[in-house]
């Protein structure tokens, strides 16, 4: 609750439901009324889950992997050939950007060929080399911002845009949090020939009768506003 009071979080809501009986075991709500003065929040409120969607994608991937559709050590380019020749951004000393000190990050960066094969396991554990526009490198941040990834209309467009961006490191070199799970979702679409949304519906949504989680906003629903924490 202190994080909500200090405006680090605009609100906090949690609920635990008994999977068999449907009874609510635990429920708690805290709202910062300055940030959300007129907002009613309860168990029926639709909200973005942001990076918690990674749990959904990884669960779907594990389900498909158990059926033998792919394996952790499979090369990513086996399913996304557009990623066969990805380049890696390096500093003037030839070190990958993820391992560079800030003083070594003069723009523009050189790029080199990958020195290892990117596998599906690298996507799982965030060592593939994909990133968000939050890196120590101004160059990479500007490149990913200007690439307009969020404007991609489908998975194939997103793959094409990503294929033109350098990786921040060689696959498997180190942990670097980024778009790796999103790429895993694109790979699942290639493996199954259907959308990630439909994979979720078929494998989690319908079997679990889960109506409270969706990839598209239900009609007539207004989502909670977004905030930048401090």
Functional labels for PLM-detected ranges:
Residues 12, 53, 118-121:
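Residue-level detector of short, conserved catalytic/binding motifs and their immediate flanks
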Residues 5, 46-51, 114-117, 178:
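Short, solvent-exposed loop/helix junctions and linker helices
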Residues 13-17, 75-77, 201:
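Outer-envelope exported proteins of Gram-negative bacteria
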Residues 11-13, 75, 174, 214:
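Residues at or immediately flanking beta-strands
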Residues 80-230:
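Short, surface-exposed loop or secondary-structure junction motifs
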Residues 18, 34, 51, 124-128, ...:
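Short, flexible loop/turn elements at secondary-structure junctions
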Residues 1, 48-76, 181-189:
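Active-site SXXK
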Residues 1-49, 69-71, 85-95:
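Short, conserved catalytic-motif segment at the N-terminal edge
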């Amino acid at each position: 609750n202190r994080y909500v009071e200090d405006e680090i979080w605009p609100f906090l809501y949690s609920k635990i439901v008994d999977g068999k009986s449907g009874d609510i075991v635990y429920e708690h709500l805290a709202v910062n009324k300055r940030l959300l003065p007129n907002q009613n929040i309860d168990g029926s409120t639709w909200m973005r889950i942001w990076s918690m969607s990674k749990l959904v994608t990884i669960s779907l991937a594990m389900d498909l992997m158990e059926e033998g559709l792919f394996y952790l050590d499979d090369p990513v380019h086996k399913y996304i050939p557009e990623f066969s020749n990805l380049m890696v951004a390096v500093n003037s000393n030839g070190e990958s950007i993820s391992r560079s000190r800030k003083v070594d990050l003069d723009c523009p960066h050189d790029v080199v060929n990958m020195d290892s094969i990117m596998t599906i396991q690298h996507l799982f554990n965030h060592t593939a080399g994909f990133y968000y526009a939050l890196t120590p490198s101004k160059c990479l941040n500007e490149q990913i911002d200007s690439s307009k990834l969020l404007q991609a209309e489908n998975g194939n467009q997103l793959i094409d845009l990503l294929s033109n961006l350098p990786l921040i490191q060689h696959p498997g070199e180190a942990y670097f949090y980024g778009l790796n799970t999103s790429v895993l979702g694109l790979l699942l679409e290639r493996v199954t020939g259907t959308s990630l949304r439909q994979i979720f519906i078929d494998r989690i949504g319908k079997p679990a009768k889960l109506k409270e989680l969706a990839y598209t906003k239900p009609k007539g629903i207004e989502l909670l506003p977004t905030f930048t924490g401090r």
